[in-house]
Amino acid sequence: MSLATLDATQHPNLPASAATLFKAKAHKKLSFEQIAQHIGRNEVATAALFYGQAKASPEDIQKLSELLNISPQVLEEQLSGFPDRGRSVEMPPKEPLIYRLYEIVQNYGYAYKAVLNEKFGDGIMSAISFSTKVEKETDADGNNWAVITLRGKW
């Protein structure tokens, strides 16, 4: 199994907590799925904590401290503030996978908007009252497909 790691030189705008968490994750050889199971979040929400894009609860801090052997005081200091969302990614993104997600919104954004407006009326989908997940599907020919679900309150 390959594990996501952090190359801080490619992410100069991440908070200090990112380096702390990724170093412990690598040392323990844990996947985001394993960490998510321990803290009771899904794996994308857990990864968002590591990148400083989500707010950690006191329970998250306690459970991460236990699992990763990081002082709760260090995690409290690094994770208890409000996230500075969105500053970690340059626009347009240069990383190919992140660029493809950006490209999906460029190509399908207005189509999503039109269909959502027809189904729900005027409004927006929340990114606060929101959840997302990633699943892997394999078709009959053995091809792997990524399935990304976005669920936001209207």
Swiss-Prot record:
Documented EC number(s): 4.2.1.104
Active site residues according to the UniProt entry: R100, E103, S126
Lyase found in the keyword field: yes
Taxonomic placement: Eukaryota, Fungi, Dikarya, Ascomycota, Pezizomycotina
Record bears the keyword Nuclease: no
An annotated Gene Ontology molecular function: cyanate hydratase activity
Gene3D superfamilies per record: Cyanate lyase, C-terminal domain, lambda repressor-like DNA-binding domains
Protein name (record): Cyanate hydratase
